[in-house]
Regions:
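Non-catalytic propeptide/linker segments at domain boundaries
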Residues: 1-13
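Short glycine-rich His-centered loop
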Residues: 12-31
Length: 173
């Protein structure tokens, strides 16, 4: 098939999963919550991918999680619903958007985590992020037996977009 040069992702479906949401803020720094930045990055990414022809599905488009209202184990319910949404989406790939945090605030830069089946995708994304953001972080494999990622059936990666613990990077995020 010939790919349209202006719409190279035409016909492709991409799920973007903004991590956390609702009662789960993710990592925090003062009044800055990971969940909010994850959502903002995801919405911006949705716009950019749509411009080149992709059909984009967000797992959430507001400040909420995906757990059942009366779930006893909210986190597991949230994970299970994200897994089902992604697996049933008929997508070509997923991008899970998160932020990093370490007590040592010197660390900065984006880092891609991948499963073996997604190493090529991870390599492309990590190289692109490093070149664009003047970073030298290396991608890492997601540890085996990681609940959510073990259950996903389509290729994809987790992208830690930067460190909320680094003041300069937090301002950029």
């Amino acid at each position: 098939t010939k790919v349209n040069a202006l719409m190279p992702l035409s016909g492709k479906i991409i799920v973007i999963d903004p991590g956390h949401g609702g009662k789960d803020p993710g990592t925090t720094s003062d009044t800055t919550y990971e969940k909010d930045i994850n959502l903002a990055i995801s919405k911006a990414l949705e716009i950019e991918l749509s411009k080149v022809g992709a059909t984009v599905i967000l797992t959430r488009d507001g400040d909420y999680d995906l757990s059942e209202p009366n779930a006893r184990w909210r986190k597991k319910s949230d994970f299970d619903n994200r897994i089902n949404l992604i697996n049933n989406s008929k997508a070509n790939l997923y991008l899970s958007i998160h932020l990093n945090y370490l007590t040592n605030s010197a660390y900065y830069g984006p880092q891609v985590f991948y499963q073996e089946k997604s190493i090529d995708l991870a390599t492309i994304i990590q190289k692109t992020l490093n070149n664009s953001l003047n970073s030298d972080r290396e991608m890492k494999e997601i540890p085996k037996k990681t609940y959510m990622y073990d259950k996903l059936t389509i290729p994809g990666v987790l992208i830690e977009c930067g460190f909320l613990s680094n003041a300069a990077e937090r301002e950029k995020l």
